[in-house]
């Protein structure tokens, strides 16, 4: 029996303030969230769209770029939305609040990658390599993580 997943959201970029905040949404309610939180009814998959991001009461939060990836052609294998907005603290907080008020919950650390692994989008070696790449602090660590990712890709291609 398949388990129905909930929809998750999280800041995918560095913490504000910054020039841009990137927020990711993934799960079964993504299309509903697009209709509720953005100034459009639908988004063409894999294209960037200039949209208004709105609060639950319809108030404008920001204008940004939104990209929708339809399942299964996304990182997690689920419907996924990425929103690039101005990277101020309040803009980021209000955007996350609107997403959560419209059906998403805040993702746990690593949850997007866990979902990708569970969907067969990547193997454990590649998932670990992604974590190593994110955590790399030296050029040697960076190089090792990239080599680990290349090895994981080659192993997947040979199957």
Which positions does each model-derived feature cover?
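A glycine-rich (often HGG/GG-containing) alpha/beta subdomain
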Residues: 1-143, 147, 151-154
């Amino acid at each position: 029996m398949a388990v129905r997943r909930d929809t998750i959201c999280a800041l995918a970029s560095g913490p504000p303030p910054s020039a841009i905040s990137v927020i990711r949404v993934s799960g079964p309610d993504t299309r509903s969230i697009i209709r509720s939180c953005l100034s459009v009814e639908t988004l063409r998959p894999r294209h960037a769209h200039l949209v208004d991001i709105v609060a639950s009461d319809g108030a404008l939060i920001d204008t940004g770029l939104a990209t929708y990836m339809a399942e299964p052609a996304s990182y997690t294998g689920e419907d996924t939305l990425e929103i690039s907005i101005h990277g101020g603290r309040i803009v980021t907080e209000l955007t996350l609040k609107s997403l959560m008020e419209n059906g998403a919950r805040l993702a746990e650390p690593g949850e997007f990658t866990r979902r990708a692994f569970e969907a067969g989008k990547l193997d454990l070696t590649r998932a670990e390599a992604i974590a190593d790449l994110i955590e790399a602090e030296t050029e040697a660590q960076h190089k090792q993580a990239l080599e680990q990712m290349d090895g994981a890709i080659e192993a997947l291609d040979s199957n």
